[in-house]
A protein has these predicted regions:
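Short glycine-enriched, charge-decorated loop/helix-capping segments at active-site entrances
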Residues: 50-53, 200-206, 275-283
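Conserved AdoMet/S-adenosylmethionine-binding subsite of the radical SAM
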Residues: 116-273
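Pocket-edge positions in alpha/beta enzyme catalytic cores
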Residues: 47, 83, 110, 142, ...
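Conserved Radical SAM active-site core
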Residues: 42-183
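Auxiliary Fe-S-binding modules of radical SAM enzymes
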Residues: 1-18, 218, 230-312
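N-terminal cysteine/histidine-rich coordination modules
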Residues: 1-43, 47
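Electropositive phosphate-/nucleotide-binding environments in soluble metabolic enzymes
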Residues: 23, 27, 49, 66, ...
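Glycine/serine-rich loop-strand microenvironments at binding/catalytic pocket rims
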Residues: 27, 31-39, 45-46, 76-108, ...
Length: 312
């Protein structure tokens, strides 16, 4: 039986498809977007992180608080004046330190499921899906990187009459989509940048495959929601927004809505916990007027456009 690795099950989500949903965030992504707000979903492997606000190693009342250091057989943990450091070259992500930590300051990100286990967990909130017109959304990361697992879990979800959405960036081989689309009710598809060279600079790959997959999904007559992260210096210029709008209008007849998602810096602490650099470290949020301006450009060409997100 195939298993999957997830980094979160977000219950009572109202932003990842219609109604009240559970979003299954699957680990592993084929892109490296500079603005990614879920960097814990990039690696297909488990990650170890340290939460400074939870740590109690300096609390004299906690006699066992340094057990994390003692149980690490690889000597990958070091307590410094600045906090706990993780030698990621040594760490095997065995999880012993996280198990020993009484404050959950050390955490393993990545939970393994088989299809039967995951469906049983998802069905716990079935009443909320049914009363709200909601269901399950598979996102990430890039859920299509674990398409073998989706081929097992999606039919089980369909047997339970659940509405299924797929949140994808489109940067995987079409053959993977062809295997799962029959079970999917809605495809939420990311369109970030229309110029291929700019797309590659921002994400690590060209966008030819992405655009081709978007067309194929539309040709398969699957309802689509388009999502565009509006990011300063990357995607937010009016020329790019207008180009995406024309692509939606001219080539994606199945698009029901287009969400312009205002840049958020909420992912910044996650980068620090993973010892990753964050390219947008000092970039401020948009103002409401700036987002309204972007939306007007989009809506003039593609009236299905809307925007959401925090502003300053």
């Amino acid at each position: 039986m195939t298993t999957a690795l997830t980094f979160n099950l977000q219950q009572f989500s109202t932003e990842d498809g219609p109604g009240i949903r559970t979003t299954v965030f699957m680990k592993g992504c084929s892109l490296r977007c500079a603005w990614c707000h879920n960097p814990e979903g990039l690696s297909p492997q488990r990650d170890l992180v340290w939460h400074d606000t939870r740590c109690i190693v300096e609390d004299p009342r906690q006699g066992t608080a340094r057990e994390c250091l003692r149980v690490c057989l690889e000597n990958a943990l070091t307590l410094t004046p600045g906090g706990m450091t993780i030698d990621r070259a040594r760490c095997t992500v065995c999880g012993k330190c996280a198990e020993a930590c009484p404050a959950a300051a050390l955490e393993i990100i990545g939970k393994e499921w088989n299809a039967e286990e995951l469906v049983a967990e998802l069905l716990k909130d079935r009443v909320f899906y049914e009363t709200s017109g909601g269901g399950i959304t598979f996102g990430g990361g890039e859920p299509m990187m674990q398409s073998d697992f989706l081929c097992e879990v999606l039919p089980r979800c369909k047997d339970a009459h659940l509405h299924l959405a797929l949140d994808t960036a489109g940067a995987v081989a079409w053959e993977r989509y062809a295997r799962v689309l029959d079970w999917v009710d809605l495809v939420m598809f990311d369109l970030k940048i229309m110029d291929s060279a700019r797309y590659k600079r921002a994400t690590g790959i060209a966008n030819d495959l992405v655009l081709d997959n978007a067309r194929r999904i539309a040709n398969a007559r699957k309802p689509m929601w388009i999502r565009t992260p509006v990011v300063p210096g990357y995607t937010a210029d009016h020329a790019n927004i207008a180009a995406i709008a024309r692509f939606i209008r001219d080539e994606l007849p199945m698009v029901e809505r287009w969400d312009l998602l205002a840049y958020t810096n909420l992912g910044k602490p996650k980068y620090h916990r993973l010892d990753l650099s964050y390219a947008l470290e000092n970039v401020p949020l948009f103002t409401r007027d700036e987002m309204e301006s972007v939306w007007r450009v989009a809506a003039e060409i593609a009236p299905v456009a809307r925007w959401s997100g925090a502003t300053r």
